């Protein structure tokens, strides 16, 4: 079938297998061109490995450090008549390229929040790898079923304490829109912490430690975004911020446990990028469009692969990691450059329906958004027939 992009709201409901493969190939080529990561990881578990930063973490480990990788995610296969999810095609492509290079790559498809997926992951590590020396936690999910109580939690994106007026781009109509977000209830805050806080990361590390599958000196990191004052009302000071603060608390206990084995645990702060998650946040398309404009003009623009490869090379495995006062690893310093933020802040209030394309890089934002789903990739023939039924040969289905 011939597959074209079909966008509904902030989700593209079609995906292109060949485009997803080309996107993965581009990221692999970036890593190979930058050269090996000195003293990098050798056996890596990535939880949330199929898109965005998690996929970039898997690619950087495999092609920057010749690491064996085990990826965990929750994706949907395609059929002859219906496309699967982008993460499915990304993983099929990643495994193909890794296998061609003689690298171990196996994936587990299921609910990473569940005990069943944790146990199956441990079985696969014991069988194939013995132990892992890096665990990357990069889950982005709207809901979580608690593995012990069975309670279902849903995350909410709201301010805390008071309503907030937000500017944003209505990405469908391409107009500037002001929205009011009402404050989260305590229940909504608690739910958001349960989904996006550090409890599940802690459960993963506890399970891996108990099973004896974490190597001496093993590291773990969870990815997060903090942002600057423009996004603080909705991020750091909002319901999601409560979850981020929980992550900062939980990492202390995890670090203590791993330190006993000569290892380490860190929260890694990454820059704002276009992801399926960020496109759902009312103000982020406008913020990202302005950020891209300013950072591209300065020559400091980066996407997922540049960020994560840099994080590995400079901080996770570098001699002089970029640490903040809270002990987090920082890869977002180019975004937080005062010159960049001041310029974004100035343009923020100047954008109108008439000058969106002039003052922002909204066209670059739209291209990046479509690239998530395998579209707008150079060299791909989008008029060609493509089979959406793509297999992942080594997939473990839970």
Curated annotation (Swiss-Prot):
Q: Where does substrate bind?
A: 225
Where along this sequence does the record place binding of NAD(+)?
48-53, 74-75, 111-112, 139-140, 244, 273-275
- Quick check: keyword ATP-binding in the entry? no
Annotated EC: 1.3.1.9
Q: In which pathway does it act?
A: Lipid metabolism; fatty acid biosynthesis
Which GO molecular function terms does the record list? enoyl-[acyl-carrier-protein] reductase (NADH) activity; NAD binding; trans-2-enoyl-CoA reductase (NADH) activity
Active site location:
235 (proton donor)
Keywords from the named record: Fatty acid biosynthesis, Fatty acid metabolism, Lipid biosynthesis, Lipid metabolism, NAD, Oxidoreductase
Any Gene Ontology biological process: fatty acid biosynthetic process
Q: What class of enzyme is it?
A: oxidoreductase
**The UniProt record lists the keyword Lipid metabolism:** yes
Q: Where is this site: Plays an important role in discriminating NADH against NADPH?
A: 75
Catalysed reaction per UniProt? a 2,3-saturated acyl-[ACP] + NAD(+) = a (2E)-enoyl-[ACP] + NADH + H(+)
What the record says about family reads:
Belongs to the TER reductase family.
Its function, per the record, reads: Involved in the final reduction of the elongation cycle of fatty acid synthesis (FAS II). Catalyzes the reduction of a carbon-carbon double bond in an enoyl moiety that is covalently linked to an acyl carrier protein (ACP).
Q: How does it assemble?
A: Monomer.
Query: Protein name, please?
Result: Enoyl-[acyl-carrier-protein] reductase [NADH]
Give the organism the record lists.
Answer: Paraburkholderia xenovorans (strain LB400)
Q: Highest lineage ranks of the organism? A: Bacteria, Pseudomonadati, Pseudomonadota, Betaproteobacteria, Burkholderiales
């Amino acid at each position: 079938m011939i597959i074209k992009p079909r966008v509904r709201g902030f989700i593209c409901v079609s995906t292109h297998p060949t485009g997803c493969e080309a996107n993965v190939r581009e990221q692999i080529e970036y890593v190979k061109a930058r050269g090996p990561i000195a003293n990098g990881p050798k056996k890596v578990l990535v939880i949330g490995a199929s898109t965005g930063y998690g996929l970039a973490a898997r690619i950087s480990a495999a092609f920057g450090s010749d690491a064996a990788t085990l990826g965990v995610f929750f994706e949907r296969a395609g059929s002859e008549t219906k496309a699967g999810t982008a993460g499915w095609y990304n993983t099929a492509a990643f495994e193909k390229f890794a296998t061609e290079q003689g690298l171990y790559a196996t994936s587990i498809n299921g609910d990473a929040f569940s005990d069943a997926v944790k146990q199956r992951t441990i079985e696969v590590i014991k069988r194939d790898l013995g132990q892992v020396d890096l665990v990357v936690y990069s889950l982005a999910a709207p809901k979580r079923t608690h593995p012990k109580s069975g309670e279902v939690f849903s995350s909410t994106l709201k301010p805390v304490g008071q309503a907030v007026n937000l500017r944003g781009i209505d990405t469908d109509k391409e107009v500037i829109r002001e929205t009011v977000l009402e404050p989260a209830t305590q229940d909504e805050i608690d739910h958001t912490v349960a989904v996006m806080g550090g409890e599940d990361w802690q459960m993963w590390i506890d399970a891996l430690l108990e099973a004896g599958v974490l190597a001496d000196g093993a590291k773990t990191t969870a990815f997060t975004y903090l942002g600057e004052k423009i996004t603080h009302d909705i991020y750091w000071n909002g319901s999601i911020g409560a979850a981020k603060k929980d992550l900062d608390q939980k990492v202390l206990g995890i670090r203590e446990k791993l330190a006993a084995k000569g290892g380490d645990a860190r929260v890694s702060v990454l820059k704002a990028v276009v992801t399926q998650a960020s496109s759902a946040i009312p103000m982020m398309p406008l913020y990202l469009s302005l950020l891209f404009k300013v950072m591209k003009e300065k020559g400091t623009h980066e996407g997922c692969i540049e960020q994560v490869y840099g994080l590995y090379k400079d901080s996770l495995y570098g001699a002089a990691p970029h640490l903040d006062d809270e002990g987090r690893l920082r890869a977002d310093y180019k975004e937080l450059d005062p010159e960049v933020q001041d310029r974004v802040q100035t343009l923020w209030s100047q954008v109108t329906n008439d000058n969106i394309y002039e003052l922002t890089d909204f066209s670059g934002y739209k291209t990046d958004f479509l690239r998530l789903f395998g579209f707008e990739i150079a060299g791909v023939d989008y008029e060609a027939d493509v089979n959406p039924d793509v297999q992942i040969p080594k997939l473990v289905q839970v």
